[in-house]
Design a protein with these regions (language model features):
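Conserved Ser/Thr-centered positions that define the repeating blades of beta-propeller domains
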Residues: 1, 48-52, 107
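Surface loop/turn signatures of beta-propeller and other carbohydrate-active proteins
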Residues: 1-25, 54-74, 112-130
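A conserved hydrophobic secondary-structure block that centers on an alpha-helix together
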Residues: 19-45, 51
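Entry beta-strands of beta-propeller and related beta-repeat scaffolds
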Residues: 29-32, 82-85, 139-142
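Residue-level signature of beta-propeller blades and closely related beta-rich strand-turn architectures
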Residues: 36-38, 89-91, 146-148
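Structural motif
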Residues: 40-46, 93-106, 153-156, 166
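Loop/turn-rich, solvent-exposed surfaces of beta-rich toroidal or solenoidal domains
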Residues: 75, 79-92, 100-106
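Beta-rich accessory regions
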Residues: 108-288
Length: 288
């Protein structure tokens, strides 16, 4: 059948950035959130329908006051007695030099504009963009696009551009989004190469640069974990001066600060898969 245009209406002041519809059914109604720029502000636009065929514009769900080009790839869903919106901030650098991240918003919603209580980055690392979630049985699962905004990917023939994060299960606790790998990820683990305790641990090289590590700290002080190294290029997970962050060396993003919202790290789960590293802090309090 021919494609059917279902949304033409958009609020006055909306420019050509008008994209990426995400549909969801809440109660007996259907809703679509669209990413847009309205009056030079990144905006989540909310549409509603009784039958998923005939749509009308409702209102701005969220208007972001920070100067960004537009909201891309918005998402919106109920979770743990709260509502969560997510959107990718296009052409934005934060105070640490990170480029184009995803933002989440947690709050209440009664059908009009969302009453936002808290907001934070979806991921404190690099290149997690256009994150989208879906409902699988009783789980809300998120997958992000690992892009290459810093131009660090070394392509090989036949080559590919970008990859995806691990599937992440979401929950809201204390009005913040907690993120953990879905339980199925752990079925991929192989043999244990080291298990023990100590302040200085050297494991050595690991075949194919693929490994999982679970680390717990008796004290929430400073530490440094070398996650990977290739000559003068390296990446570490570091706690120093009340901040937890990725420390980069010898790569194009080594001047960028990838700082977590976590101030005191009690534990970390580390997944390394070739060119990708994912770290989950404090049982899902933050991820990068």
């Amino acid at each position: 059948e021919p494609e059917k245009e279902i949304i033409r209406e958009k609020p006055e002041g909306t420019n050509y950035d008008f994209r990426d519809p995400k549909a969801i059914k809440i109660g007996e109604k259907y809703y679509i959130v669209l990413g847009a720029c309205v009056d030079e502000k990144g905006t989540f636009l909310l549409y509603e329908s009784e039958d998923a065929e005939n749509w009308k514009y409702r209102c701005p769900l969220i208007t972001e006051e920070t100067r960004i080009r537009t909201i891309e790839c918005p998402d919106f869903f109920p979770l743990d007695d709260k509502y969560v919106a997510m959107g990718a901030w296009m052409s934005h650098y934060d105070e640490y030099g990170r480029f184009q991240q995803c933002r989440y918003y947690v709050g209440d919603w009664n059908g009009d504009a969302m009453d936002v209580h808290t907001q934070q980055w979806v991921d404190f690392g690099s290149n997690c963009y256009a994150a989208q979630s879906f409902q699988h049985e009783d789980r809300r699962i998120l997958i992000g696009w690992i892009s290459d905004f810093y131009g660090e990917h070394i392509a090989t023939e036949p080559g590919a551009y970008g990859s995806m994060t691990l599937p992440r299960e979401l929950h809201v606790k204390n009005e913040h989004v907690y993120t953990k790998p879905v339980e199925e990820v752990y079925t991929l683990l192989g043999d244990t190469v080291y298990e023990g305790t100590g302040r200085e641990i050297k494991v050595g090289s690991i075949a194919d640069n693929r490994y999982y590590a679970s680390v717990s700290f008796e004290e929430t002080g400073d530490f440094n974990i070398l996650l990977g190294q290739d000559g003068d290029k390296s990446i570490s997970l570091t706690a120093e001066g009340g901040k937890v962050f990725f420390k980069m060396a010898g790569v194009k993003s080594d001047k960028v600060q990838f700082v977590s919202s976590v101030e005191k790290c009690r534990n970390a789960e580390i997944f390394v898969d070739g060119r990708t590293i994912e770290v989950y802090l404090n049982d899902g309090e933050d991820v990068g």
